[in-house]
Amino acid sequence: MADIQLSKYHVSKDIGFLLEPLQDVLPDYFEPWNRLAKSLPELVASHKFRDAVKEMPLLDQSKLAGYRQKRLAHLQLVLITSGYLWQEGEGGAVQRLPECVSKPLWNVSNDLGLKPVLTFADICLTNCKVKNGDIEVMYNLPGGAGTEWFLKVCGLVELAFGKSGQAIQNVLDGAKANDKAKMASGFTDLTAAIGNMQTALARMNENLTPEHFYNGVRPFLNGFGGPASPISGGLVYEGVSDKPVTMIGGSAAQSSTMQVLDGLLGITHSPEKQAFLDEIRNYMPPSHKQMLADLTNMPRKVPQVVAETKDANLTKAFNGCVAAFVQYRSYHIQVVTKYIVTASKSDSPKSLAYKDTGKSDLIPFLKEVRDDTEKVQQ
């Protein structure tokens, strides 16, 4: 069995895929980026953000030092991009991004292996800082406290999963060594972590209404390109290429957590669904994408080890973990229904699907993925 160590993929056993704490501003040379990213909500609200971006100097991204600075720069630049594109709402979107943003964003994206668009890795994994066991949001999108709460809850869900790092490692190490007790312990702890993820996700209801999310937050997470997109022809990155680029928008579908659990528990999907999930991986940090590939390609997968042991305690722990994951996915469907489907009264199903999953039917897709999860019970 392949030796998979979380640290190899820049995954912490304490905070998972969240980026280790870093400074929330770049060095003084990049102060124009710091200032615009921090003041985005106020400047968008006053309809002055685009003008401020146009006055921004073209800075040299090669002066960034190290991986974390580059991740922070990517966060700032995609936030600036989002504010610039969507300041006037979906009906007032522009189709060209000024060179002062597009060129450094393109180059930083190439350095990191990330897409030059707002992704979950930016708005959550980089933007949510773990502080005293809680989540602190460094940069906000327009919408005030409701928007900040949405971002914080996304971070809390990731943190709940992140605390299962040792449990996941125990399952993998136990499977490699045929250590039934270690695997069972890992599954038990992972089951608790999935329950904590659901508890964290349920907190969305405390300070975020469906109307605020759909009309206030979601537009700033939009991608571009395609018949249902407000920027149907794609976005031109000035100073990079005159050819418009198509990108999907940022969403929790780009979180690696669900696909890690799929890989660990041996959950498989139809070729069509898997093709979409594979495409989503291209919007994740490369090390996280590699971890998913390695989990998928393990020659002797975890469920096979569980089945071969014929150990009642291990099988019970495995099935309990699968059941918790099914329950989480069922609850996630309820959240999506409340905050996206029900709130999208003016959007066609096709438009809704484009904006949120790229699938032709959002809820049926999520239900099928949940049903695929249930099938791996032993």
Curated annotation (Swiss-Prot):
InterPro entries reported in the protein's UniProt record: Indolamine_dOase, Trp/Indoleamine_2_3_dOase-like
Cofactor binding, note field: Binds 1 heme group per subunit.
Cofactor(s) this protein requires: heme
One GO CC term, this protein: cytoplasm
Keywords in alphabetical order: Heme, Iron, Metal-binding, Oxygen transport, Transport
Organism superkingdom: Eukaryota
GO BP, sorted A to Z: 'de novo' NAD biosynthetic process from L-tryptophan; L-tryptophan catabolic process to kynurenine
Single annotated GO MF: oxygen carrier activity
Matches recorded under Pfam families: IDO (PF01231)
Disulfide bonds: none
Entry binding sites for heme: H332
Gene3D superfamilies (UniProt xref): 1.20.58.480
Family assignment from sequence similarity: Belongs to the indoleamine 2,3-dioxygenase family.
Function according to Swiss-Prot or TrEMBL: Serves a reserve supply of oxygen and facilitates the movement of oxygen within muscles.
Complexes and interactors: Homodimer.
Protein name as it appears in the record: Myoglobin
Organism listed in the record: Haliotis madaka
